[in-house]
Amino acid sequence: MAKFVFVTGGVVSSIGKGIVAASLGRLLKSRGYSVSILKLDPYLNVDPGTMSPFQHGEVFVTEDGAETDLDLGHYERFTDTAMSRLNSVTTGSIYQSVINKERRGSYNGGTVQVIPHITGEIRDRIHRVASNSNADVVITEIGGTVGDIESLPFLEAIREFRGDVGRQDLAYIHVTLLPFIGTSGELKTKPTQHSVKELRSIGIQPDLLVCRSDRDINDELKRKIGGFCGVPQRAVIPSLDADSIYAVPLTLEDEGLCREVLDVLDLEDHDSDMVDWAQLVHKLRNPGPAVKVALVGKYVQLNDAYLSVVEALRHACLAQDASLDLHWVCAEEIENQGADVLLKGMDAVVVPGGFGNRGVDGKVAAIRWAREQRVPFLGLCLGMQCAVIEWARNLAGLTDATSAELEPGTTHPVIHLLPEQQDVVDLGGTMRLGVYPCRVSAGSLASRLYGEEVVYERHRHRFEFNNAYRNLFLESGYEISGSSPDGRLVELIELPEHPFFTACQYHPEFLSRPGRPHPLFRGLIEAAQQRLPCSPSEAMRQQNNSAAGSSHPSLQP
């Protein structure tokens, strides 16, 4: 039978509940326990798929095609465990389900209320994750802040959960903030006390407090917090600001978080194996030479809009003993100032996914610059479509070529709507979503990077390469290096004569992990490193490798 951990947050929003939940998942897994983590989001949207990236950040796509909160990306990257649509729950999806049941007569004419019907549906979703995942421990992060009216049904549901399982089968963790007041030179505990008081008024007594702070929390302060909040001093867990989110599991391990959780859950505290994770963090803190990577997008004002892309680049740099010098480049600014100005000195260019017309010409200009300057380039989803548009306009002489998404009446729709999308009206949850196979062409750059004939990647798109232009595309020197098994849908393109120029219709960033970077991102960073000046000893090593025919085998033509 599964055990359950609930993570709430107080004092301020964006306090790091998702990282705490993901870190606990990592620590439990290091002790041999299987884990599943779900997010309860208090907004009324059914899912974040139609929400603006400026408001919500990126949409993380699961294997089964759910459009979810970006925290699920943290869960997957930290635990190396695939989540599903069951792991993402919103207020909108709960109300939709309850109303649909009411319309079907499932409540036998009863009055449908927040309690017990909404809270009961929430509890059912948590139980469903436990039964479908067969996890030893199910961790649930409750979005929002204690005191928000939107979160009340979720908090009531996790209070009621005590009646579903034994008290020894669940633990409540409350993440809070200890602000430092410079004039008094003190960390203040009063906001934490009031946050816990609010939680208690709902009927939840936290078992552990994770206290965020920018400086050390001494034993006297922990004793004070524990006394006022009704938790043992040992269960007051400091969480100091970290230089990397990947350092947080190690910090929380040192502070005893997992040990205390296991004690509350009456589970054995097995030996923990965090050696590989510690080595990863050591490499993060002691990186090699920096590679300058330009991320050209339309949502660059909010970095979270491209969170998984950035993490995938970090993973690749870790594997290549490089440090990431990331440059955020607004695609619209390229339209105003030119690619030569904004991309000068870059070692690689990434054009990620997106929707809509704004900034597309800037992305196309960035891709042209990377192609002509022979700078390593990786395009993702819309980035691949922009690479096709760039080819059509600048190499195929189709100067008005574009995507049918951007200009439905274009005479040269080199990107057009997927046939199965022709009659789709609703926007939410209706794209080509989730994992699909891609057959990789033998002898291609992609084949050398993947080392596999068939790969499975996550998708999120409505538009595709228009096969009416396939022959012209191939005659121009480009290669279609990956396609759907039936050969109809173009999944990967590349330019063989270029040091590294590849783009994919899918989102490889969702499959990258700290200790297992995605091959396309690792290939990009490896190619970017070839542009760096190297020390005499490194130059000699490369010369020897070249003489032996073994320099960078994954990128050899």
UniProtKB/Swiss-Prot annotation:
Binding-site residues for UTP, renumbered to this chain: S13, K188, T189, K190, P191, T192, Q193, K224
Molecular function per GO: ATP binding; CTP synthase activity; glutaminase activity; identical protein binding; metal ion binding
Binding site for Mg(2+): D71, E141
Entry's EC annotation: 6.3.4.2
Region described as Amidoligase domain: spans on this chain: 1-267
Reported regulation of activity: Allosterically activated by GTP, when glutamine is the substrate; GTP has no effect on the reaction when ammonia is the substrate. The allosteric effector GTP functions by stabilizing the protein conformation that binds the tetrahedral intermediate(s) formed during glutamine hydrolysis. Inhibited by the product CTP, via allosteric rather than competitive inhibition.
Active-site residues annotated for this sequence: C381 (nucleophile), H507, E509
Family annotation (SUPFAM superfamilies): Class I glutamine amidotransferase-like (SSF52317), P-loop containing nucleoside triphosphate hydrolases (SSF52540)
Misc remark: CTPSs have evolved a hybrid strategy for distinguishing between UTP and CTP. The overlapping regions of the product feedback inhibitory and substrate sites recognize a common feature in both compounds, the triphosphate moiety. To differentiate isosteric substrate and product pyrimidine rings, an additional pocket far from the expected kinase/ligase catalytic site, specifically recognizes the cytosine and ribose portions of the product inhibitor.
Protein family according to the UniProt entry: Belongs to the CTP synthase family.
Protein name: CTP synthase
Source organism per UniProt: Synechococcus sp. (strain CC9311)
